[in-house]
Design a protein with these regions (language model features):
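FAD-binding core of FAD-dependent oxidoreductases
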Residues: 20-30
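A short glycine/serine-rich beta->alpha loop
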Residues: 12-21, 92-98
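Acidic-glycine-rich active-site phosphate/pyrophosphate-binding loop
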Residues: 1-11, 80-85
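Amphipathic alpha-helical interface segments
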Residues: 32-33, 43-121
């Protein structure tokens, strides 16, 4: 359900609540892999192994083409940059400075390609 997905993914913005850690769109890819491939049996190491392999392959592809999976690195920020928990206003000027929309599209594209290759869609 769209509303549930939006609620679950809201904290992903800004590299997990503006902490500038793993990019939210990368985390979103990983969630989709879990939905497509995972199961609810935590003792099933075969499934877990396959999910982890897929996550690592997607992360490597994203990093290879974009230089990182870390938000602050993708944005060109220094590690010691102090970020507020208050999100910036989303204006046209804001989006001109951010690669986020393009990275979201890129992640969706490689995820779709991967899911097709694995016959999951």
């Amino acid at each position: 359900e769209k509303e549930t997905a939006l609620k679950i993914s809201e904290p992903f913005g800004g590299g997990m609540g503006r902490m500038r850690e793993v990019c939210g769109t990368v985390t979103g890819m990983f969630m989709v892999i879990g939905l497509a491939m995972g199961n609810d049996n935590s003792k099933d190491n075969t499934t877990k192994k396959n999910v982890y392999k897929s996550v690592q392959e997607l992360a490597a592809k994203f990093k290879e083409d974009n230089g990182s999976i870390i938000c602050r690195e993708l944005l060109g920020f220094q590690k010691n940059n102090k970020e507020s928990y208050v999100p910036s206003e989303r204006t046209n000027e804001y989006y001109k400075k951010r690669p986020c929309p393009e990275l979201c599209k890129y992640a969706a594209d490689i995820l779709e390609e991967y899911l097709k290759k694995e016959n999951l869609i």
